């Protein structure tokens, strides 16, 4: 049996996945990119040649994988019709366009994958696919599997590093699909090793979308507006107050998870960890001092040299609040979590404080007097936007 895979996107991740998946026996890869004339440019750039994926292995060696997608197109009917697996490797803000494009053509037995998904992926998918949403299966990954960069558009991409383990959540539909975990593992190769989370809300809650806003707030929350000489260190430059804010937001995540389990027995969110535990698990080899969250972040070697997003101004630099750390992490992260918290009846004052500060910085209005009634809520992926107003609706997809 040939597994038909549609890879959505034209960026670093789409290049990498297309090349790796197309190299597997019994796999047909179609690439769907809706952006401008990207499909035409990719087709022209590749010509009659093969796509090359350069993989930097953990032992220091390099492997070259050469393959060729069957088709690269802007036409969703060609790419989606009959596809067993549809994988979105585009930023969250672009998901809506792809869901709308696939809706008329996606088959009931399709597995729809967000790689990564970001919070609210399932709500948006269910809303746009309508009646089909109950049949299809949805899989959400927490991040991209690799650090990767296009070296030559349409022809060559390099994998700089590959994660060892990656978690995914799964909502099974009523129709029978290809086996989700083993199929995705086969498409990617030996690493990362994929593990299945117990619940899709575990992935949503543990996306920790408060981290970037909290660090920005910690550094710039009381900023006097005067330029600074250079961009401050981002993670390694946090203070104890920021670590305390991160802990408070994390505790509120646990509160919401516990409330959902109490209200809706049978929904297991017991794997929702506090952020300190998460750091110890995922970065144990990189952390030099792990006795508390503050030191776990500031001594994390993988964060060395990473600085705040800034823009040049007269006299130095100033914070760039138009960066994705706020423009994506608020509407596609914190607001989604806020919506779940409201449905669960749990107050999250620390998260609210960050949202109120951040929305002012990016000129948006989501939260008004603790309620999601702002004029820009319709641009977010909170469940309420789609009519999922209760815990039951959030969990089942039935409004």
Curated annotation (Swiss-Prot):
Keyword field contains Transmembrane helix: no
Positions contributing to NAD(+) binding: 148, 324
Binding site for pyruvate: 118, 143, 212
Effect caused by changing residue 329 to A: 2 to 10-fold decrease in specific activity. 43-fold reduction in affinity for pyruvate and 18-fold reduction for L-arginine
Regulation: Agmatine acts as a competitive inhibitor of the condensation reaction where the L-arginine and agmatine substrates compete for the same site.
EC number(s) from the headed UniProt entry: 1.5.1.11
Keywords: NAD, Nucleotide-binding, Oxidoreductase
Effect of residue 324 to A: 2 to 10-fold decrease in specific activity. 119-fold reduction in affinity for pyruvate, 200-fold reduction for L-arginine and 4-fold reduction for NADH
A Pfam family: Octopine_DH
Catalytic residue list: 212
Top EC class, one word: oxidoreductase
Biophysicochemical property: pH dependence: Optimum pH is 8.0-9.5 for the forward reaction and 6.5-7.5 for the reverse reaction.
Binding site for L-arginine: 206
Residues binding NADH: 10-13, 35-38
Position of the signal peptide: none
Molecular-function GO term, any one: D-octopine dehydrogenase activity
Outcome reported for the amino acid change (mutating residue 148 to A/S): Reduced catalytic efficiency but no change in the activity. 3-fold decrease in affinity for pyruvate, 3-fold decrease for L-arginine and 2-fold decrease for NADH
Residues the record lists as binding substrate: 118
Organism domain of life: Eukaryota
Keyword Oxidoreductase: yes
Function, as annotated: Catalyzes the reverse reaction of octopine dehydrogenation. Acts on L-arginine in preference to other substrates such as canavanine, cysteine, L-alanine, ornithine or norvaline, owing to the presence of the positively charged guanidium group.
Entries under PANTHER family matching the protein: BLR6086 PROTEIN, OPINE DEHYDROGENASE DOMAIN-CONTAINING PROTEIN
Protein name: Octopine dehydrogenase
Natural source organism: Pecten maximus (King scallop)
């Amino acid at each position: 049996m040939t597994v038909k895979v549609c890879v959505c996107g034209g960026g670093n991740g789409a290049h990498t996945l297309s090349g790796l998946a197309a190299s597997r026996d019994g796999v047909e890869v179609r690439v769907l990119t809706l952006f401008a004339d990207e499909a035409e440019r990719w087709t022209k750039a590749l010509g009659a040649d093969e796509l090359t994926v350069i993989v930097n292995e953990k032992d220091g060696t390099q492997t070259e994988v050469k393959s060729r997608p069957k088709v690269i197109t802007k036409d969703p009917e060609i790419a989606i019709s009959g596809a067993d697996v549809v994988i979105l490797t585009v930023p969250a803000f672009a998901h809506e366009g792809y869901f709308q494009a696939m809706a008329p053509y996606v088959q009931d037995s399709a597995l729809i994958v967000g790689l990564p998904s970001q919070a609210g992926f399932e709500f948006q998918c269910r809303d746009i696919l309508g009646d089909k949403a109950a049949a299809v299966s949805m899989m959400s990954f927490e991040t991209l599997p690799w650090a990767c960069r296009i070296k030559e558009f349409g022809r060559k991409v390099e994998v700089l590093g590959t994660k060892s383990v990656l978690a995914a959540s799964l909502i099974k539909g009523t129709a029978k699909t290809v086996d989700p975990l083993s199929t995705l593992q086969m498409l990617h190769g030996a690493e990362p090793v994929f593990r299945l989370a117990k619940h899709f809300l575990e992935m949503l809650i543990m996306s920790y979308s408060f981290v970037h806003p909290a660090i920005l707030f910690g550094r710039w929350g009381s900023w006097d507006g005067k330029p600074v000489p250079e961009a401050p260190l981002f993670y390694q430059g946090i203070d104890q107050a920021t670590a305390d804010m991160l802990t408070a937001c994390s505790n509120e995540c646990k509160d919401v998870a516990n409330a959902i389990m109490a209200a809706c027995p049978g929904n297991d969110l017991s794997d929702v960890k506090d952020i300190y535990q998460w750091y110890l698990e995922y970065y144990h080899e990189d952390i030099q001092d792990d006795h508390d969250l503050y030191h776990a972040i500031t001594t994390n070697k993988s964060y060395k040299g990473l600085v705040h997003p800034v823009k040049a101004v007269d006299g130095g630099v100033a914070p760039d609040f138009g960066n994705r750390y706020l423009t994506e992490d608020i509407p596609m992260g914190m607001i989604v979590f806020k919506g779940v918290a409201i449905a669960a009846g749990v107050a999250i004052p620390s998260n609210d404080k960050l949202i109120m500060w951040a929305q002012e910085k990016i000129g948006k209005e989501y939260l008004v007097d603790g309620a999601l009634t702002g004029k820009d809520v319709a641009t977010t992926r909170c469940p309420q936007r789609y009519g999922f107003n209760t815990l039951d609706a959030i969990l089942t997809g039935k409004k």
